[in-house]
Structures are given as C-alpha cells and as structure tokens.
C-alpha cells in the first residue's frame, strides 16, 4: 500500500542522498521490518527505563504498566490456569508488541507492521510452534496421541481433521489481524488524502478501538491454544 508520506522513508532518502526506499527494499530494508524493529526498540527502552525507576509506590508510567500487566495476568490465569503462568511472558510480549504495532498507524508518517502479512505470519507461527512445544513439554510424546483420537480404528478419519485444524490456527491468526489492520490503514489513507482536516479524527478514534480489539483477540486465541496443549491428553 502506498502511503502519502512515511517519516522513515523521508529519513532514509535524506541520509542516502536521494536513494528511494523502494530501491532499498531489494536489500532487505522493508518498511514493515523497519517499523517492527522500531517498536521492539521502543518497548525495550521503556522496559529498561522502568526497571531502573521501579518504586514501591508506583506512579505515572509504572502504575499504568502494572495495571495492564495485572489485568493481562488475571486473564491468563482464567484462560490457561496455574500451569500457564510460566508462559505469561510470551503472552505479555505478544500483546504489547501487537498493541503498539497497531497504534503506530495512528501517527502520521508511520506504517503499522501488523498491516503486513509477513509480520503477522511470524507472530502466528511463533504461537503455533510454542503450542506444540508446551504440549510435548507437559505430556511428552503422549501429546500426539490426541491427534488420532480415543478409538484406534477412527484414526484415519481423525488424524487428517486434527492436522488441518491445527494448521488452520496460524493461518486464521495471521489473516484476521492482517485483514483488519490493512483495511483500517486503507480507510485512514483515503480519508487523510481526501479530507486531511477534522474528518479523519473519528476514524482515528475508531482505530484505537480496533487496535485494542485485535490485540485482545490475537492474545486470547494464543492463550486458548496453549491452554489446550496444557490439558491432559486424552
């Protein structure tokens, strides 16, 4: 998707003596990858800053982060149970990265990494891989017994269904997030191009809602998949 203006595009062209970002993309300098690294650096910087300034009486940013993490931890406990607490860092990292990747779309001149299918596919594959790692860690090789079902003579029928169902998970995670964020990005670009003042404001407010909803849906589904792997194999 062509943006009317990208801050990083201007920055690259300025410091590379007019080399366009489209030419640099052939060398791996992709817009969504650059913005994804920007989000990761931002989150890392905020985490290090909070670590240095931790206080028993939280205030400001620390208070906000604690509220978000406590509520997210409560949701994780309700969804995954006590065994799922060891996987909370993964869930929290996914939630924060996706949320900030969605919200950066509301800043003129920046493109959301989650509006690119490659970014979402990487996140979805990470959840997919971790789900089965959790299953094997908790149940050993017995984890794979649920792929063939409880009755052996139904295995030829159950096995393909289970495989298709599990492969559909990362596909649905990636496409759902991509479709919603890419569609919202198109609408924002159209409104900013046609009517750059006042009218895009309601769309930006809706964008905040979309960013939080999509973060919640992706994170909740990730927790549900991990919770399924944590359950006793049948």
Swiss-Prot record:
The chain crosses the membrane at residues 29-49, 90-110, 116-136, 147-167, 186-206, 207-227. The keyword rRNA-binding does not apply. It comes from the Bacteria. GO terms for biological process: proton motive force-driven plasma membrane ATP synthesis. It is found in: Cell inner membrane. Pfam families: ATP-synt_A. It is a multi-pass membrane protein. The keyword Flavoprotein does not apply. Gene3D superfamilies: ATP synthase, F0 complex, subunit A. F-type ATPases have 2 components, CF(1) - the catalytic core - and CF(0) - the membrane proton channel. CF(1) has five subunits: alpha(3), beta(3), gamma(1), delta(1), epsilon(1). CF(0) has three main subunits: a(1), b(2) and c(9-12). The alpha and beta chains form an alternating ring which encloses part of the gamma chain. CF(1) is attached to CF(0) by a central stalk formed by the gamma and epsilon chains, while a peripheral stalk is formed by the delta and b chains. Belongs to the ATPase A chain family. HAMAP family: ATP_synth_a_bact (MF_01393). This is ATP synthase subunit a 1. It comes from Syntrophotalea carbinolica (strain DSM 2380 / NBRC 103641 / GraBd1).
């Amino acid at each position: 998707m062509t943006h009317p203006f990208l801050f990083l595009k201007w920055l690259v062209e300025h410091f590379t003596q007019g080399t366009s970002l489209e030419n640099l993309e052939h060398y791996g300098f992709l817009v969504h990858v650059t913005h994804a690294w920007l989000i990761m650096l931002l989150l890392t910087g905020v985490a290090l800053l909070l670590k240095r300034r931790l206080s028993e009486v939280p205030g400001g940013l620390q208070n906000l982060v604690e509220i978000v993490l406590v509520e997210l931890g409560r949701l994780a406990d309700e969804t995954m149970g006590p065994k799922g607490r060891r996987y909370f860092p993964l869930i929290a990292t996914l939630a924060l990265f996706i949320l900030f990747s969605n919200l950066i779309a509301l800043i003129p001149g920046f493109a959301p990494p989650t509006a690119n299918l490659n970014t979402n596919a990487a996140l979805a594959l990470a959840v997919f891989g971790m789900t089965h790692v959790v299953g094997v860690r908790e149940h050993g090789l017995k984890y794979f017994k649920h792929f063939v079902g409880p009755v052996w003579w139904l295995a030829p029928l159950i096995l393909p269904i289970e495989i298709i169902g599990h492969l559909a998970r990362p596909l649905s995670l990636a496409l759902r997030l991509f479709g919603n964020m890419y569609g919202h990005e198109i609408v924002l670009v159209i409104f900013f191009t046609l009517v750059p003042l006042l009218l895009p404001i309601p769309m930006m407010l809706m964008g905040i809602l979309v960013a939080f909803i999509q973060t919640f849906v992706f994170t909740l589904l990730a927790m549900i998949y991990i919770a399924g792997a944590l359950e006793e194999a049948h």
